[in-house]
Amino acid sequence: MNYLTSQLLINEEIETINNNLKNQSDLWEDGKKTAGSYASKVKNNLQINRNSELSKKLAELIKNKLLANPLIKSFALPKLIHGIMFTKSQKNMGYGRHVDNPFMSSGRSDLSFTISLTPKDLYEGGELIIETINSENKFKLNAGEIIIYPSTYLHSVEKILSGERIVCVGWIESYVKSIEKREYLFDLDAGAKGLLAKHGRSDELDLIFKSYSNLLRLLGN
């Protein structure tokens, strides 16, 4: 399965975001407003109005954190980060099985991401389920942790049994659309950087970095 989990936000950032969301409780609205015609039938959560100044400010914070993270940049090769929103699921809320729209008003969805803003021991249920051809994978993230996965996968969020789950979600349009090609580039980049850290610069390593850059030019769009 082609996905990445990583700690993205520090405690101070999580606290700042949550305090802002709590202070603007009037901005929460029905999550169905931004779902596609099919997904709206299985979506049951709340979200902050994306046109609000608060949403725009917090979305910019998240976008900057993603673009400043070398691991995420290497994995996702982000061309555009878009559609960032903040959602809340309370008791008996969830999001049924669906696939994300391939094209949104804000861009193409190659990769989807979820960032947890709630400690996982403060709510029951609410696991993110991502389906592949032969497996079903459940994730319950630590506060500040992100998961990035292909938007082509069917996925769902289980009903909340108690407490509430607040997350940030969004999409990435990648310079490389293909899952397989992104994986090859990620492996090559990680291997080259590992060799550089272990052995230092060399003429041979220069050729590997050259090949990576030229492959990205060839495969990217």
Curated annotation (Swiss-Prot):
Instruction: Tell me the SMART domains matching this sequence.
Output: P4Hc
For this protein, what does the record note about how its cofactor is bound?
Answer: Binds 1 Fe(2+) ion per subunit.
Cofactor(s) needed by this chain: Fe(2+); L-ascorbate
What are the residue boundaries of the Fe2OG dioxygenase domain, all occurrences included?
Answer: 80-174
One Pfam family hit: 2OG-FeII_Oxy_3
For this protein, the Enzyme Commission number is 1.14.11.-
GO MF annotation terms: 2-oxoglutarate-dependent dioxygenase activity; iron ion binding; L-ascorbic acid binding
Q: Which Gene3D superfamilies match?
A: q2cbj1_9rhob like domain, Rabenosyn, Rab binding domain
User: Where does this protein hold Fe cation?
Assistant: 98, 100, 155
What keywords were assigned to this record?
Dioxygenase, Iron, Metal-binding, Oxidoreductase, Vitamin C
Q: Where is the signal peptide?
A: none
GO BP annotations of the record are: DNA damage response; intracellular iron ion homeostasis
What PROSITE patterns does the entry give? FE2OG_OXY
What is the main EC category here?
Answer: oxidoreductase
The residues that the entry says bind 2-oxoglutarate are 165
Supply the InterPro entries for this chain.
Answer: Oxoglu/Fe-dep_dioxygenase_dom, PKHD_hydroxylase, Pro_4_hyd_alph, Pro_4_hyd_alph_FE2OG_OXY
Matching entries from PANTHER family are given as: PKHD-TYPE HYDROXYLASE YBIX
In Swiss-Prot or TrEMBL terms, this protein is called PKHD-type hydroxylase A9601_13531
| Provenance organism | Prochlorococcus marinus (strain AS9601)
What lineage, starting at the top, does this entry show? Bacteria, Bacillati, Cyanobacteriota, Cyanophyceae, Synechococcales
